[in-house]
Amino acid sequence: CPENANPGEILHDFTNLPRLVGGINDNITKIIKKIYDFVFSVELIEMPNCKTANAVKLTTNVFRDVNIAFVSELSLVFEKLGIDTNKVLEAAKKKYNFQVHYPGAGVGGPCLPINSYQLLNTAKRLGSNLSIIESSRKINEKMPEHVIKLTADAFEECNKSIQNSSILILGISYKPNIKDTQLTPAKKIINKLQDLGAKIYIYDP
């Protein structure tokens, strides 16, 4: 049973969403199903084994990581073309089979980046190459640098120096409405701006 819960909605997820069940053998799987039936009466999706169950979680999380990298890279080009990426995505998601993802300052949290690197390391150990995932990780890791560049450009346009300037960071968690800051890209941005001499103030509503 791979852990699969959305931070901030853990109780709802455990009591409402279908759960994957896959043990090291059939007997273990039956025991796990009985425990779930006793604690959480939700739909159980039986997998052939625990390896397959974990592969489902890895696939869904890496899918998101890759697609966030895709739209983030698109946004860098659209920015130069004077195109509002959010307008593009809002229109695109009206198409029934388009799964919208949004660009940002990077990807953080305890799952997406780690799961991508987990798959990359596994593939490397097997002599395989997951080039799309590897490229996506590089894109997402670089996005904080773009935010810093945008900030520096804005100061330059205003004929101001970042050094000794006060900058307010609104939100440092890796996603809205949670207190978790694991691997948040905001930390890279904050550290770099502090290195440049900025006075950083943080507020996360």
Can you annotate each of these PLM segments?
Residues 1-205:
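Structural/interface elements that position substrates and couple domains in central-metabolism enzymes
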